[in-house]
Amino acid sequence: IFITHSHYDHIGALSEVKRVWPKAIVYGSSYAEYTLKRKSTFEGILHMSNVAAQEYTGENLAEPLDMSRIQVEQILQDGACVKFGTDAIYGLETPGHTNCCMSFYLESEKVLILSESTGMVRGPKCTTTCVLKDFAQAKQSVERCRNFLAEYFVFPHYGIIPKRLADSVFETIVQDMEEKETMVTELYQQGVS
């Protein structure tokens, strides 16, 4: 199990997945490991999971989350790989959305599974960014992934896009980042925090 970052909408089901497949190993960044050991992280995951459950079902979670199953069990350093027989998955640290973001490259298929630092696709010609930590890091993460050897890119909350289309998607994501960075800078200079 490879986690891109520690937000509830990406790992909220991890407790149940680990209950069903207890021998599965959870891989993530060292910062994700640190984050998932914090009480405040658990409280946030529980709260947001209940908010989502309320929104979709009108009820809280049927069962409480077992935080002991929501942990990084194996730290994957930047550039490190995990072998699966003759195949390998490589981890790429891609911060910007959070400090713990990672993207993953499945070598045999030439597929790069992106973290939210690299932006999101909402539909045809509609992209957005969700930079919560650092615009410069997010832009570096986009460029790193954009120039990677991948033939296919899996965008978070969307799906797979081939390389021939991904370049224009990345371009609109960078433009969106720059617009948002300008807006945030202007608001900050006006005293808004």
Model regions and ranges:
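Active-site HxH/HxHxD metal-binding segment of metal-dependent hydrolases
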Residues: 1-74, 80-81
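Short, acidic/turn-prone active-site loops that include or flank metal/cofactor-
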Residues: 31-33, 118-119, 178
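Short beta-strand or tight-loop elements
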Residues: 72, 80, 85-90, 100
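Soluble or luminal CAZymes and related metallo-dependent hydrolases
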Residues: 74, 133-137, 176
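Metallo-beta-lactamase
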Residues: 88-168
